[in-house]
Amino acid sequence: MGSPNAAAETDLTTDDFIGDTRRDSGSDTETNTDCDGEDLPLLLLPAPPGHFEEGERVLAKHSDCFYEAKVLKVEFKDNEWKYFVHYIGWNKSWDEWIRLDCLLKHSDENIEKQKEQGLKQQGIKSAMAWKVSKMKPRSPNVARGRKRKQDSVDTEKNVLPSDNLLSFNIPPALRKQLLDDFEFVTQMQKLVQLPRSPNVDGILKKYIDSQMKKHGRVTDSLEEILKGLRCYFDKALPVMLLYNNERKQYEESVSGGVSPSTVYGAEHLLRLFVKLPELLVHVNMAEETLKELQDNFVDILRFLRKNQSVLFVSTYKAVEEMEKKEG
């Protein structure tokens, strides 16, 4: 997925991780006796229970969610197996190395287990755990559009072009919020103080509470959508939701397995809504699923607008001011 405002991304290839496992020795005898475990060809290494092979379709765990993925490379290093996986339907810049304990066999049984934990089978296939029919790349005849500058969050592209799947408007008041946010961070060099209260988790909970109060219940599909939105926020924030001068703050605030959704608030959640149409162009949805998703997005934006004075910060602070207070 393109990232106009994140730090420069590097598309790592498997060659960057896997070296030549063959020894350059003078004889077969030397090769067999003068080598350690790391230099053995992969075929000679023992395969532990649950070993996954190159090209195998799997369920891979990321940010507490399982997604459909494919194993591209396998490596035995530091006394453990590691797997380079590609998440189906995602840009290759999301490919990553993960450990054995983050993989599940792609089986009906495992899919059912995830369903019992709150993810529906179709949702596992989606980058956001939403019910979709399948993942597929963008059609070659769909224009990518002009390349935007590195340090910007696109605040004007709030309506999806007609040749894409999803279309919703960002209310004028929230669009102004985005523009003010842009000016504070990029021009005035001020940041939102972290951690935010309420954070993204808290905002989504408040939204659920409002739906419960309004309708007397919350549907399973809405809970699934909100869970997917949270997972997607956690994955997308460091990649495309930060301005360059926010990155140091991110590195200092999000570490040790902390989820961005527990640290950041409405300001960055709103940035995600700007990006969602562009990101969901890769997802092929049934018509009724698309309408449900779109209606929920519109309603969440309406909720953000209605509670704008409570959910969004009124003042941004200079970095020096925050560092002085922390000291």
UniProtKB/Swiss-Prot annotation:
Tissue specificity remark: Ubiquitous. Mainly expressed in the vasculature of cotyledons and leaves, and in roots and inflorescences.
Subcellular location: Nucleus
Knocked-out gene: effects: No visible phenotype, due to the redundancy with MRG1. Mrg1 and mrg2 double mutants are late-flowering under long-day growth conditions.
Alphabetical keyword list: Chromatin regulator, Nucleus, Transcription, Transcription regulation
Highest taxon of the lineage: Eukaryota
UniProt GO MF annotations: euchromatin binding; methylated histone binding; promoter-specific chromatin binding
GO biological process: epigenetic regulation of gene expression; regulation of DNA-templated transcription; regulation of long-day photoperiodism, flowering; regulation of timing of transition from vegetative to reproductive phase
This protein's record includes keyword ATP-binding: no
Keyword hit for Transcription: yes
Protein name as annotated: Protein MRG2
Organism whose genome encodes this protein: Arabidopsis thaliana (Mouse-ear cress)
Gene: MRG2
